[in-house]
Amino acid sequence: MSAAPVFSRRAVESFVPEGSPRTYQIAPLTYLERQNYRADMTRRCGPLPSQAAMMSALRAAIREASPGNAATLLVTVDDFEAEPENDDLKAHLAALEAVAMGVPVYAEQRALQERHLGMIPWVAAQHALRGWEGERLPPFARERGLVPEDLLGVLPEGELLAVGWKAFSLMQPDQAAAGNSEPPS
């Protein structure tokens, strides 16, 4: 019998970022805490553009940037969607995306995507950190269930990223935990 996944704020893990003399206590978030994390991400960054929205914006950008050649270029996009693991198609798509960045409809979607991805570690750390210890760290505090922004801002950037990504990874059940409960009947 396998153990149930742990998503309790009481199950704190100690984490030491590579090369750091400091230790951070990170808690896997409960269901409600994960919903609050997702809501905060949406408030801060807007919704994460879906793959379909990104591809639609890319198509629109291609039509705008290269109207005379759009039909040929759009075949590459269609082929990539049919074979997303094809390395040649990935390279062609990357070239199209680079050109599309000059078109606002695509550039705005990419900016939303980048902001969202860039904020994941910050917001995850804000929600999941439960303490820290080590040199040159101020006393730990939480206000209204979160680490205050000014306090989080004093962490070295590399450590903040490592802590945040670790916190984010603790929000996702691993493959062993994902299928360890019986489906509802």
Label each residue range with its predicted role:
Residues 1-17:
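Short acidic, Pro/Gly- and aromatic-enriched capping/linker segments at domain boundaries
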Residues 20-185:
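Short, surface-exposed, charged amphipathic helix/loop patches that serve as local interaction elements
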